[in-house]
């Protein structure tokens, strides 16, 4: 089957600009599509970090002011590996340090509508016959609200087929009606089946309404966001477009997250060499100042410390861990009261509980390798990555059956052990008591070393590479092109 030309439009891309999962996807999915033989280019703003990383990027197009509120800009071309980047250079909109969406006080930049309206407009322009480049994509792939206006421009002005991917539906990019003219959208776009949403212009709603096809980052999340509880007001629209909506589970970087070759571990290991994992446990206990012992399970957490992540449940029951007996290591930051609560616990039980506020990439890898079990009781989780890292590292996770957690973690029971799919523990409910019962179940199961090893190996043998996801996206792109035709 013929290869496709794809424009992947994003507001962030690891390792240069990342606030969440979108940054990881923007680095990994285009690379997987390129490896599969497709002609893909990634469009993103020329933030300071990108301009510093690619000082020799060349100008490939000068772009006029497309609308009253949008300044002139230019496109720079750069190369990372075999992947071509198109950097949208507009210093007055993007030459700002730090977080791409928030100022130093943590507030949204007041001109975010213009900043990401321009990004969306340029993405659409590259997919139109009058593209400033000699290259034109078959498909424009928008991601989250920051580029979700691109399908609207393509709908009203004509051009390539489009896909919009929802990474987190809670963020919708809503602005005042005055932005309609400022962004160069036609007056007739202001209607319920256009860009209007509760008397505001919503970038995400516009994309969901007008894209050729829609995706989100796991099959379960695709179902959940059609329900009022998870849809943040957009569930009726998503139910209406359910035939064009599919969930495609994110992959993980299997080179970066590989316990056999991970350079920051005390020693490498694999599914057939699990004894070496115990060395990593002892090394983690030593590094974190915990009692070095093989006789109690070590639970690990790497997370934002928020109620959305379910860490309030763990905070409520964690003081019981030393009596089980069990240990706990926590790496993360978030809600200040929750941070303080975990820090106080660590002070009370210094040999069995340790808490590090902040983030450390190397330590994250060592926790995945050294912990016996990973705790991730999120109340909602569109896809989630840490549960897949945990499975790769032979560290069975505790999760709730939501979003991508439900699509990747199979609860330990008689049937799943028999068919070799059991790889983790799914807690029944959304209460501290439910989590505690699951922790006790984990501790009992962990005592049976042969059974525990089977569970570890089941998880380690799952394929979480991006190859499968890339193939699903190609099928989605072809459906979008057929729909547009």
UniProtKB/Swiss-Prot annotation:
Cell division in keyword set: no
Family annotation (CDD domains): GT5_Glycogen_synthase_DULL1-like (cd03791)
Pfam families listed in its UniProt record: Glyco_transf_5 (PF08323), Glycos_transf_1 (PF00534)
One GO molecular-function entry: alpha-1,4-glucan glucosyltransferase (UDP-glucose donor) activity
Catalytic activity: [(1->4)-alpha-D-glucosyl](n) + ADP-alpha-D-glucose = [(1->4)-alpha-D-glucosyl](n+1) + ADP + H(+)
Amino acids binding ADP-alpha-D-glucose: 18
Source organism, top-level taxon: Bacteria
Entry annotated with the keyword Thylakoid: no
Enzyme Commission (EC) number: 2.4.1.21
Involved pathway(s): Glycan biosynthesis; glycogen biosynthesis
Transmembrane segments: none
GO BP: any one term: glycogen biosynthetic process
Keywords, in A-Z order: Glycogen biosynthesis, Glycosyltransferase, Transferase
Entries under SUPFAM superfamilies matching the protein: UDP-Glycosyltransferase/glycogen phosphorylase
Homology family: Belongs to the glycosyltransferase 1 family. Bacterial/plant glycogen synthase subfamily.
Purpose of the protein: Synthesizes alpha-1,4-glucan chains using ADP-glucose.
Protein name: Glycogen synthase
Organism (species): Dechloromonas aromatica (strain RCB)
